[in-house]
Structures are given as C-alpha cells and as structure tokens.
Regions:
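N-terminal cap/lid segment of alpha/beta-hydrolase-fold proteins
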Residues: 1-18
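Acidic-and-aromatic substrate-binding clefts and catalytic sites of carbohydrate-active enzymes
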Residues: 33-34, 142-146
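Gly/Ala-rich beta-loop-alpha elbow adjacent to hydrolase catalytic centers
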Residues: 113-118, 122
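Serine-hydrolase catalytic machinery in alpha/beta-hydrolase-like enzymes
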Residues: 9-12, 22-103
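Short beta-strand immediately N-terminal to the catalytic nucleophile in serine-hydrolase-like folds
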Residues: 111-114, 138
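Conserved hydrolase catalytic core segment
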Residues: 124-134
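Short helix-loop-beta connector
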Residues: 105-108
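Active-site nucleophile loop of the alpha/beta-hydrolase fold
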Residues: 58, 136-144
C-alpha cells in the first residue's frame, strides 16, 4: 500500500488506504515514528477491513499532546497542555478534510491511536468527545502528572 502526502492545515499528513473506507485510523506521529509507519500499515492491511490511515505529524510532542500543563518529569522540557488544540485540529480540519477527499461516510468508524504521549492523548481525547469508535494506546504515558 503506497502513501500519499496531503497538506491538512499546516501539516503534511501521510495517508494510506482507499476511498469509501469503513474505518478511519488516525495516528499522531513524531518524526521518529515515520520510518516504521509503512510496516504498521502493511500489518493492518492484512485484515479484511477497508480502511484509511492518516499519520498526523506532531511538532512539539510535549506541548501538543499533553492534556494540561505540567513540569518536566525527565530532562528540562515541561508540558504545555495544548491537547485541546490538537483535538480541535483533528475534529475541525483533519477529519472533515479526509471525509471529503476520500468520500467517507458520516458514520465512518474513527479509531484514534498513538504511542507513548500520543497514546495518552488518545485516551484523554476519548474522554472529551463521543466521536471515536475505538482507541489504540500503545504504552501510553499514564505516568503523566495528574492522570
């Protein structure tokens, strides 16, 4: 399955899959994860499900994915608490754009996934809105202060 890059907002999202998909898989990704995305999508493609996968890049991981501000836990960089802005970007730009460009049903099953802090973001986002059919949180950062 080949990828295409689609500019959504100011972010180059990597998109895999087909129009009219039954599932829309969204994954917040850092630069360090992009090398393994092709393998991840190939594994998902082994299923019989028709899906569209979007790797949505995150520039400042600690700020964009943290649900609230918190001091540094390791190192010197704290957490900015901008997860609400990231969730708004997904719901107001990414999802509507993908639905339109790939002719997805209004009832498409949306699954939000992520690893580490992106996994925590996925868990948190599922508590904020009733939009996601499922969440995949791989090794989520549940150590996050206040979680």
């Amino acid at each position: 399955m080949t990828a295409q890059t689609m500019q959504i907002g100011n972010r180059p999202c990597r998109i895999y899959g087909e129009a009219h998909a039954e599932y829309l898989l969204l994954q917040m990704t850092g630069e360090h994860e992009l090398q393994s995305i092709d393998h991840e999508v190939a594994a998902i493609a082994q299923s019989s499900r028709n899906f569209l996968f979007a790797a949505v890049p995150v520039e400042n991981w600690n700020d964009a994915l943290s649900p609230w501000e918190a001091p540094a836990v390791w190192g010197k960089q704290g957490f900015g608490g901008n997860a609400a802005d990231t969730l708004r970007f997904l719901t107001e730009q990414v999802i509507p754009t993908l639905k339109q460009q790939f002719d997805l049903s209004e009832n498409v099953k949306i699954i939000l996934g992520g690893y580490s802090l992106a996994g925590l973001f996925a868990l948190w986002a599922s508590t904020q809105i009733n939009l996601f059919y499922g969440v995949a949180a791989a090794s989520p950062s549940v150590w996050f202060p206040g979680w």
